[in-house]
A protein has these predicted regions:
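Active-site-flanking segments in enzyme catalytic domains
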Residues: 5, 9-208
Length: 208
């Protein structure tokens, strides 16, 4: 699939080691194209919909899956992005030491912080939530998923079913996606992470 090609990983990464279940035409709410359900690890796409939502929802699934691989204190339904931010506040050393985790940590720092203070990206999302009286866009897992999908849309390989609407439209105009410079740095962190993960897994499979 295009996501596998972009990330340069084997299929087991896309399926999250076979733990990710796909559901079509079930669940969700009115107007929802796609959603991820941590309980059961289900990625659901609405019938005749879901276009442009797959990368966003897949990252939610990845964010959930990787939490226990990245942090010692991960509960079953927690996201790595949220745990990373919580650990910055509590200053707890709970991240497993590994180069791949360092790439993810750098990406989360890019999303949430500017020189140790809340990032401009976060401040825009928080202001939008305050105006709409709804806490959603500034949630760590939502900021991370929007960042990931925009990084993918900026790449040469285009797939409007995978991602769409991150470079134009109301959400983009409202500043709910990363600035260009931030997105470019995130691309470096995330693509390096997945390329290194893919290489390590291919070597492991080749040794079997």
């Amino acid at each position: 699939c295009d996501l596998q090609t972009i990330l340069q990983v084997p299929t087991q990464v896309i399926s999250l080691n076979g733990s990710l279940a796909l559901s079509f035409g079930t669940g969700g709410s009115r107007g929802t194209c796609a959603f991820y359900q941590p309980q059961g690890r289900v990625l659901a796409l609405a019938k005749n919909a879901g276009g442009g939502s797959l990368a966003h929802e897949w990252f939610h699934a990845f964010d959930h899956y990787i939490a226990s691989k990245m942090f010692k204190n991960a509960a079953p339904v927690q996201f790595a992005s949220r745990l990373w931010l919580q650990n910055q506040v509590t200053d707890k050393e709970t991240m497993y030491s590994h180069q791949l985790n360092n790439w993810l940590s750098a990406a989360f720092a890019e999303i949430f912080l500017d020189a140790g203070a809340p990032s401009a990206f976060f401040l825009r999302a928080r202001a939008f939530d305050a105006k709409s009286q709804r806490r959603y866009y500034a949630l760590p897992e939502e900021m991370a998923a929007r960042s990931f999908e925009q990084v993918l849309q900026r790449l040469p390989l285009q797939n409007r079913f995978l991602v769409d609407g991150t470079l134009a439209g109301p959400a983009f105009e409202a500043g709910l996606y990363p600035e260009t410079a931030r997105a470019e740095r995130l691309a470096c962190y995330w693509l390096s992470y997945f390329q290194q993960l893919g290489t390590a897994l291919e070597l492991k499979l080749g040794a079997v």
